[in-house]
């Protein structure tokens, strides 16, 4: 199974900076298997970057509309159908920043996941507990509740990103045992919904303060790859992470 690196740029880079960054990565193409890397860039850049870099890279939207219609009077919204028209094959859904800052709830996230699936876009669904749930030992129940709202997607091609909210951007990383415990539970819950005659195509990645310094250890936690934020904005750390992940295959 190919290991995955999702590079989430968030609201960083001008368009020219984005092009320069990807050009630098292109210069390393002989040493990096780019097919395993998904760049989640600002939605505004998707069309231009895909035009400039053609099929060199996989690109992901950082969000997608919850509106089921492909078009309509919805100011500011970008439908899954619009993304698919650009040949965008991935979209991040339910990132903790959107849950917190934009009050996205389980129904909103489920709608976005369903819209992605209906348009042959692979949703990268972010789940994870706040520090309160970790401290009071209810984190497994918290995560299970998040998963219950998207259980309809478990027979589809999706990526689940486990990102403890308290770990994102904090330099605090769960222990390997902690990550493995959650990953194991996720797989157990998935298996309840997947018939025996259907192959499990769900991949699980870890996100939350992933860096070049801890990637080797994180990869021992039974995951299929990583979702990285800040560390993916610097070429040296990103290439180190990619090379390390490649070593698994």
UniProtKB/Swiss-Prot annotation:
Keywords: Cytoplasm, Gluconeogenesis, Glycolysis, Isomerase. Its EC number is 5.3.1.1. Pfam families: TIM. Gene3D superfamilies: Aldolase class I. It is an enzyme of class 5 (isomerase). SUPFAM superfamilies: Triosephosphate isomerase (TIM) (SSF51351). The active site is at 95 (electrophile), 163 (proton acceptor). It comes from the Bacteria. Substrate binds at residues 8-10, 169, 209. One of its GO terms (cellular component) is cytosol. Pathway: Carbohydrate biosynthesis; gluconeogenesis; Carbohydrate degradation; glycolysis; D-glyceraldehyde 3-phosphate from glycerone phosphate: step 1/1. GO terms for molecular function: triose-phosphate isomerase activity. It is found in: Cytoplasm. Homodimer. Belongs to the triosephosphate isomerase family. NCBIfam families: tim. Involved in the gluconeogenesis. Catalyzes stereospecifically the conversion of dihydroxyacetone phosphate (DHAP) to D-glyceraldehyde-3-phosphate (G3P). This is Triosephosphate isomerase. The gene is tpiA.
């Amino acid at each position: 199974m190919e290991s995955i690196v999702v590079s989430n740029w968030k609201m960083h880079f001008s368009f020219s900076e984005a092009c320069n960054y990807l050009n630098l990565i292109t210069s390393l193409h002989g040493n990096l298997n780019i097919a395993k890397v998904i760049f989640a860039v600002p939605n505004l850049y998707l069309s231009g970057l895909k035009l400039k870099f053609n099929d060199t890279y996989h690109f992901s939207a950082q969000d997608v509309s919850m509106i089921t219609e492909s078009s309509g009077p919805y100011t500011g919204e970008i439908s899954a159908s619009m993304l698919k028209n650009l040949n965008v094959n991935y979209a991040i859904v339910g990132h903790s920043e959107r849950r917190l800052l934009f009050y996205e709830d389980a129904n909103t996230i489920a709608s976005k996941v369903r819209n992605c699936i209906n348009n042959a876009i692979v949703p990268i669904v972010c789940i994870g507990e706040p520090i309160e749930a970790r401290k009071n030992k209810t984190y497994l129940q918290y995560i299970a509740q998040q998963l219950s709202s998207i259980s309809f997607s478990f027979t589809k091609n999706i990526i689940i990103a486990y990102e403890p909210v308290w770990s994102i951007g904090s330099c605090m990383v769960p222990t390997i045992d902690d990550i493995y415990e959650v990953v194991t539970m996720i797989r157990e819950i998935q298996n309840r919904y997947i018939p025996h005659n259907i192959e499990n195509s769900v991949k699980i990645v870890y996100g939350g303060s992933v860096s070049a310094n801890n990637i080797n250890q994180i990869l021992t936690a039974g995951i299929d790859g990583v979702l990285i934020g800040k560390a993916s904005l610097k070429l040296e750390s990103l290439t180190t992470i990619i090379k390390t992940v490649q070593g698994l295959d």
